[in-house]
A protein has these predicted regions:
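Low-complexity, intrinsically disordered terminal/linker segments enriched in charged
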Residues: 149-241
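N-terminal Sec-pathway targeting helices
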Residues: 15-30
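Short, surface-exposed, charged/polar-biased interaction segments
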Residues: 20, 77, 89, 98, ...
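Short, Lys/Arg-enriched N-terminal segments with co-localized hydrophobic residues
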Residues: 4-15
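Acidic, glycine-rich loop-and-strand cores that form catalytic or ligand-binding grooves
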Residues: 117-169
């Protein structure tokens, strides 16, 4: 059950191997956005971004896929987050290698990474989708190898549930869009200190009938490096690097 001001932000916990960095950067943010806006609102009008956030958290608590689909464009959110995150990854691959020389995954160049990402994009987005399926439907039994990976990632995500709190800092509206600012804070545990603080900005877009949908993260550039550091630190914490 999601609680006021508290839920997960899985950071690097769902890293299974270095190839998974591309998809993990996205899955981490998606689950964070779905799960961390667990805030209590006063009753609000239906056609407001605050109402949409309230319905999202209710849908997560109730495992209500139909309601979640009304207020979160999961495919658009996954694709946009993946594309921005992997574009930064390819662009900054040499910088990442300098920061983390022990990580063989960063020992490539931009051209290689661009091709690698293009080849993996469809499979990675499918894995992200299945990870979210298993996160919201924990009793589902994995069947395929991809299911097994996604199930493991979803379980690792849940392992972080008690280590992060989230607070809605504000909502700014501009025409038919709104930006929700969410401040995320880790506790004093090893997991909580993987990314001690992070501010995520999520865009909600008003639909034709007036209701708002969560569609993308707007500050991917800003949060990329703290998340990568969290992934690397998790890897070290587990003794795998």
């Amino acid at each position: 059950m999601l609680r006021f001001n508290q839920k997960i932000f899985p950071k690097g916990a769902i890293l299974m191997n270095h190839k998974n960095l591309l998809r993990i950067l996205t899955a981490t943010l998606l689950v964070a956005i779905f799960a961390t806006v667990g805030l209590v609102y006063a009753k609000t009008a239906e056609r407001t971004p605050e109402y949409a956030l309230e319905k999202i958290i209710q849908a997560v608590n109730d495992k209500d896929g139909a309601t979640l689909a009304r207020y979160v464009d999961a495919d658009a959110l996954a694709a946009a987050t993946y594309d921005e995150g992997t574009a930064i990854l390819a662009r900054d691959i040499e910088k990442l290698h300098a920061l983390y020389p022990a990580d063989w995954f960063f020992r490539h160049d931009t051209a290689f990474m661009t091709n690698y990402i293009a080849e993996r994009r469809t499979d990675d987005l499918a894995l992200i989708s299945r990870t979210l399926d298993f996160y919201f439907h924990p009793s589902e039994t994995p069947v395929t190898r991809v299911d097994g990976n996604a199930h493991w990632l979803a379980n690792e995500t849940r392992a972080f549930e008690d280590h992060y709190t989230a607070k809605l800092a504000g909502v700014e509206e501009n025409g038919n869009t709104a930006i929700a600012t969410i401040d995320i804070t880790g506790d004093a545990s090893d997991y909580g200190q993987l990314v001690p603080t992070l501010t995520v900005q999520a865009e909600l877009t008003q639909q034709a009938d007036g209701h708002y949908m969560l569609t993308r993260i707007t500050n991917g550039e800003e949060i990329f490096y703290p998340i990568v550091k969290g992934i690397e630190d998790y890897w070290t914490l587990q003794g795998w690097q």
